Every structure is written in structure tokens, then in C-alpha cells.
């Protein structure tokens, strides 16, 4: 992932907050906290995986530099993006009564305006217009999810 200069500065500042020794390194055990400070929400399993599955004792002894940390952040961000699409589609699949990849526009309207991060009526209508309902008032939810998450 290519980070903007602003994002790199933001990451550097967060990294330095955890760098107790001022040597430009942090302990493996701090990486998860830095990722979370930067707005990510990885599971402990995700963090362990991105660290290369180190033995537990290395978490408090082995260190990483900022240049080693950035690719870890990029990997977690990629996972998050991928996960959210899968999660979204999975959540909408519940409403796919006929198992044909489509849900009723009315149901989708209800879901978007009442669950999770609620959207305003205008946002819902605009999103549904982009989702192109078929003549039966159904929307292909996988395509719609891609549209919605890619903005």
C-alpha cells in the first residue's frame, strides 16, 4: 500500500509515542497497540500473524523499526478492507430468500437506514439509485456492496 506523506507522518508520530528508548524501535508486543492507535481494529490473532507468529517471549524482547512496521500496517489495512466487503455481503445474504444473489430494494432500504451505521434517507435513496433495481424491485447485493464500500 502506498501511504500519503500525511499518513506516514501520522504513523511515525504514533510509532514514536510507543518508542520508550528513543532508538526508533518498539517491542513486538506494542505493534497491536500502535495499529489500534492508528484506527485499525485487528484481532490479537491478526497481529500475531502479521508479526510472523513469534514465540510469546519475543513479544517483550524483540523489536521492530518504523520501516519494518509500515508493511505490517499495510497488511492489516488490506485485510480490513477485504474483510468488510465479505462481512457486508454475508450480512445481506440473510435477506436473499430465493438464494439468487438479489434482495428486495425495500428490505435493503430498511437495513441501511436502521442497522449499524445508520444512513440518512437521502443517502439510502442515492445508494439505491446506484444499485439499479431490476423490474421486480430487487437489487443484486454483491455488486451493490462493492459500489457502497468503494464509495
From Swiss-Prot:
Transcription regulation among keywords: no
Keyword Cell division found: no
Residues modified to N-acetylalanine: 1
Domain EF-hand intervals: 6-41, 83-118, 119-151
A Gene Ontology cellular-component term: myosin II complex
Alphabetically ordered keywords of this record: Acetylation, Motor protein, Muscle protein, Myosin, Repeat
Annotated PROSITE patterns: EF_HAND_2
Gene Ontology MF: a single term: calcium ion binding
PANTHER family, per database record: MYOSIN LIGHT CHAIN 1, 3 (PTHR23048), MYOSIN LIGHT CHAIN 4 (PTHR23048:SF1)
Function statement: In molluscan muscle, calcium regulation is associated with myosin rather than with actin. Muscle myosin contains two types of light chains: the catalytic light chain, essential for ATPase activity, and the regulatory light chain, a calcium-binding protein responsible for Ca(2+) dependent binding and Ca(2+) dependent Mg-ATPase activity.
Full protein name: Myosin catalytic light chain, smooth muscle
Species for this entry: Halocynthia roretzi
